[in-house]
Curated annotation (Swiss-Prot):
Keywords: Acetylation, Centromere, Chromosome, Nucleus. This is Serine/threonine-protein phosphatase 2A 56 kDa regulatory subunit gamma isoform. The keyword Zinc does not apply. The gene is Ppp2r5c. The lineage of its organism: Eukaryota, Metazoa, Chordata, Craniata, Vertebrata. GO terms for cellular component: chromosome, centromeric region; nucleus; protein phosphatase type 2A complex. Belongs to the phosphatase 2A regulatory subunit B56 family. The modification N-acetylmethionine is found at M1. The B regulatory subunit might modulate substrate selectivity and catalytic activity, and might also direct the localization of the catalytic enzyme to a particular subcellular compartment. The PP2A-PPP2R5C holoenzyme may activate TP53 and play a role in DNA damage-induced inhibition of cell proliferation. PP2A-PPP2R5C may also regulate the ERK signaling pathway through ERK dephosphorylation. Residues 476-508 are annotated as: Disordered. It comes from Mus musculus.
């Protein structure tokens, strides 16, 4: 690349195929020249568009020539879209070169913080200043790839592994508009160049590995996963071993990263696509999710519950049997979560007909796992909505298998009695220890210096247990009431945030009046 020596110019010229620096000039329209000269003019315009301009340090420089380039790009987009047999062999190297000159650049360092301070949902992205030109270059290249005249056998000499690697590096751009074009461009290249497919997958793997184990920061993970979702959908059966390894060693560890919320929908789609292709992968996938289950991040836990329900929607009954016990042990913990959104999301599983059919077929294993958590939280959870959902789940279990429900109730009652007996024995043991201490001659001396508190009767965790019949009645009544509450037409009231307590802010709010009020006062 060469820099123009014109004073005050921000132009940079790529002159690989010319004799030296050149100034852009407004060329004729392609449609205004004879057909025999159109190819030559097309190539001239492609070379003209290799001139780069400064949009950052001096946005107002070279406005005339920036408009010349914009018009040329726009014209070429229209030309290859609406004309046939215009992409001849000499056009391929020029078109690829023009794209490379404009696009392949070192991305600026992120203006947002990295590491724990980075919040992908709050931090504003830095938009590309040269987008008026870059957008048209992307549009041209996409039309070029999608044209009926495009021949991959000719293009593969220019669109090679090096080109793909540089294209993938651009996915870390902060500008979402650019990443959207990149996603479509890479997908078209993957579809048309069979020889590059394995290489593209390998390089995407490398980006993911670096993201998971080194940087934990990359702007294009969601877009890359979206491309992979389409690729996975086209995998032939039976799945190759390399594809299974990709799922287990690359996709599943992506659940560990802090910024999961940015790309989770695309990741969940990829995982479900694999399970639809090969149901035998269900057990390792679910066990990996349980392994990576968040311990202290409730919003992330809700995401895991969403994904798990998507998996259960496509699970085979034979595979469900393998994972149901560890799965429902985790669900029991979620139902007990003090974070109401986690508990609520877990209890919504009981509104899913297919999941309920799986539970019904395996109630003998599942109900004993879930019953203690459901019963305890029906009395002790702080959120009333959760009470209604729990009673609904208990009612469904009760209707599913009355005898099993009674057995679980009695078993739970027996366990509570055991806990009370253990607690009583513990209290009695402490009383014996205190009495032995009192029998010691030195007791009086030390008791004055340090008063010994009388043991307090300790209560076991959870509420007092009800009679079985009373429990059934309570469950039915509460579930019915919860259904009524859900069906009520609630008025749409906007929740208002509390006003700040700062007196200066309050005075400013009181003194504030709308512009229309001021205008009406002036009108008087």
């Amino acid at each position: 690349m060469l820099t123009c020596n014109k004073a005050g110019s921000g132009m940079v010229v790529d002159a690989a195929s010319s004799n030296g620096p050149f100034q852009p000039v407004a060329l004729l329209h392609i449609r205004d020249v004879p057909p025999a000269d159109q190819e030559k003019l097309f190539i001239q315009k492609l070379r003209q568009c290799c001139v780069l301009f400064d949009f950052v340090s001096d946005p107002l420089s070279d406005l005339k020539w920036k408009e010349v380039k914009r018009a040329a790009l726009s014209e070429m987009v229209e030309y290859i879209t609406h004309n046939r047999n215009v992409i001849t062999e000499p056009i391929y190297p020029e078109a690829v070169h023009m794209f490379a000159v404009n696009m392949f650049r070192t991305l600026p360092p992120s203006s947002n913080p990295t590491g724990a301070e980075f919040d992908p949902e709050e931090d504003e992205p830095t938009l590309e200043a040269a987008w008026p030109h870059l957008q048209l270059v992307y549009e041209f290249f996409l039309r070029f790839l999608e044209s009926p005249d495009f021949q991959p056998n000719i293009a593969k000499k220019y669109i090679d592994q090096k080109f793909v690697l540089q294209l993938l590096e651009l996915f870390d751009s902060e500008d979402p508009r650019e990443r959207d074009f990149l996603k479509t461009t890479l997908h078209r290249i993957y579809g048309k160049f069979l020889g590059l497919r394995a290489y593209i997958r390998k390089q995407i793997n490398n980006i993911f590995y670096r993201f998971i184990y080194e940087t934990e920061h990359h702007n294009g993970i969601a877009e890359l996963l979206e491309i992979l979702g389409s690729i996975i959908n086209g995998f032939a059966l039976p799945l190759k071993e390399e594809h299974k390894i990709f799922l287990l060693k690359v996709l599943l560890p992506l659940h560990k990263v802090k910024s999961l919320s940015v790309y989770h929908p695309q990741l969940a789609y990829c995982v479900v696509q694999f399970l639809e292709k090969d149901s035998t992968l269900t057990e390792p996938v679910v066990m990996a999710l349980l392994k990576y289950w968040p311990k202290t991040h409730s919003p992330k836990e809700v995401m895991f519950l969403n994904e798990l329900e998507e998996i259960l929607d496509v699970i085979e009954p034979s595979e469900f049997v393998k994972i149901m016990e560890p799965l429902f042990r985790q669900l029991a913990k979620c139902v007990s979560s003090p974070h109401f959104q986690v508990a609520e999301r877990a209890l919504y599983y009981w509104n899913n007909e297919y999941i309920m059919s799986l539970i019904s077929d395996n109630a003998a294993k599942i109900l004993p796992i879930m019953f203690p958590s459901l019963y305890r939280n029906s009395k002790t959870h702080w959120n009333k909505t959760i009470h209604g959902l729990i009673y609904n789940a208990l009612k469904l279990f009760m209707e599913m298998n009355q005898k099993l429900f009674d057995d679980c109730t009695q078993q739970f009652k027996a366990e509570k009695l055991k806990e009370k007996l253990k607690m009583k024995e513990r209290e009695e043991a402490w009383v014996k220890i205190e009495n032995l201490a009192k029998a010691n001659p030195q007791y009086a001396v030390y008791s004055q210096a340090s008063a010994v508190s009388i043991p307090v009767a300790m209560e076991t965790d959870g509420p007092q247990f009800e009679d079985v019949q009373m429990l059934k009645k309570t469950v039915s009544d509460e579930a019915r009431q919860a259904q009524k509450e859900l069906k009520k037409d609630r008025p749409l009231v906007r929740r208002k945030s509390e006003l700040p307590q700062d007196p200066h802010t309050e005075k400013a709010l009181e003194a504030h009046c709308r512009a229309s009020e001021l205008l009406s006062q002036d009108g008087r």
